Amino acid sequence: MFKFNDEKGQLKCSFCGKTQDQVRKLVAGPGVYICDECIELCTEIVEEELGTEEEVEFQEVPKPHEIREILDDYVIGQDLAKKSLSVAVYNHYKRINSMSKSEEVELSKSNICMIGPTGSGKTLLAQTLARILNVPFAIADATSLTEAGYVGEDVENILLKLIQAADYDVEKAEKGIIYIDEIDKVARKSENPSITRDVSGEGVQQALLKILEGTTASVPPQGGRKHPHQEFIQIDTTNILFICGGAFDGIEQIIKRRLGKKVIGFGSEVKQDELKPGEYLSKVLPEDLLRFGLIPEFIGRLPVISSLQPLDEEALIEILTKPKNALVKQYKKLLELDDVNLEFTDEALREIARKAIERKTGARGLRSIIEGLTLDVMFDLPARDDVETCIIHDKCVTEGEPPILKMKDGSEVAMTKPEPKESA
């Protein structure tokens, strides 16, 4: 039987027989020891056998047209954004595949910056992309990040979320997608560099630079702050696709000032470009982001800039009815489980869209409006068995009138709210 101790009482590796003095580390198991050299050798053997299988995962990246078609199933409008995202994502994973081959041309990484008002579909686009590609996906909020050494989250915690989404499979996480929301909130507070330290603005941008470009980062497995006596997870960010999104409130004014008044020809009149509100975002350039407060190095690591337009009335109506996860379909299904049909008139849908535009909440505000309209319906109808159909019309939205109920006996009545009981 193999001895785990030599004559001097030193521990030995159960595989190669080297003592603890001859190796860097011995890992103990129940009645067995293995050294770091044997671990490395075993890893190489396993990688050689399984490596070819792992490479197949990304051999068939969907073509840009295919990515765009799937995005159309979930996201309404934003055609230009979907087109640029499809190309950027396709090129990113094509680049990963090409890295395994020895080629003279080195392809650089193309992270994405999405600019658009709240509720325009930035997060949904990123989530749908991850679903299409079947890769780990994590969402991080830039507002909670601070420079290392200050109260708040370190930028490495973003990577931890991705590792957790990949069930701690680091190799899988290294080909994932990270969406950093509210990136505009880490803009420099003023255009001129300040002598005071900006730990939640420019400091965060500086901390994100290396991760965005590609580095081997040390991530604390439990999150939180680093301390020298803990083990770290090493993750290479070279092949992680970063998508940064934000509303960038006020950038339209910067673009307007840059476009300014243009003179065409000699002696011609000064002419002002007339664009509709929201169209200015499509004219955004890196210099506008610089004036907004992003540092040049940070802008340089986000080469693909994609702008999303504010959603108009027609787009919001389509969002309510067309996608696979459309809100109207969801609420119809919920009442269908109680054997009641739910219907929204075309005028009601239009008024819901108008209300969302008034509130300036975009698609995100649609759910709260419908929730308010259907609260009494969802509360009362499950207890009744005489109702066949519930119709929500435009007056329900504009004047707060009750929905119309079609009864099983063929009659139609307005839904009545139960009278509150008088307190004794």
Curated annotation (Swiss-Prot):
Gene3D superfamilies: 1.10.8.60, ClpX chaperone, C4-type zinc finger domain, P-loop containing nucleotide triphosphate hydrolases. GO terms for molecular function: ATP binding; ATP hydrolysis activity; ATP-dependent protein folding chaperone; protein dimerization activity; unfolded protein binding; zinc ion binding. The keyword DNA-binding does not apply. ATP binds at P117, T118, G119, S120, G121, K122, T123, L124. SMART domains: AAA, ClpB_D2-small, zf-C4_ClpX. One of its GO terms (cellular component) is HslUV protease complex. GO terms for biological process: cell division; proteolysis involved in protein catabolic process. Zn(2+) binds at C13, C16, C35, C38. Keywords: ATP-binding, Chaperone, Metal-binding, Nucleotide-binding, Zinc. SUPFAM superfamilies: Glucocorticoid receptor-like (DNA-binding domain), P-loop containing nucleoside triphosphate hydrolases. Residues 1-54 form the ClpX-type ZB domain. CDD domains: RecA-like_ClpX. It comes from the Bacteria. Belongs to the ClpX chaperone family. Component of the ClpX-ClpP complex. Forms a hexameric ring that, in the presence of ATP, binds to fourteen ClpP subunits assembled into a disk-like structure with a central cavity, resembling the structure of eukaryotic proteasomes. ATP-dependent specificity component of the Clp protease. It directs the protease to specific substrates. Can perform chaperone functions in the absence of ClpP. This is ATP-dependent Clp protease ATP-binding subunit ClpX. It comes from Halalkalibacterium halodurans (strain ATCC BAA-125 / DSM 18197 / FERM 7344 / JCM 9153 / C-125). The gene is clpX.
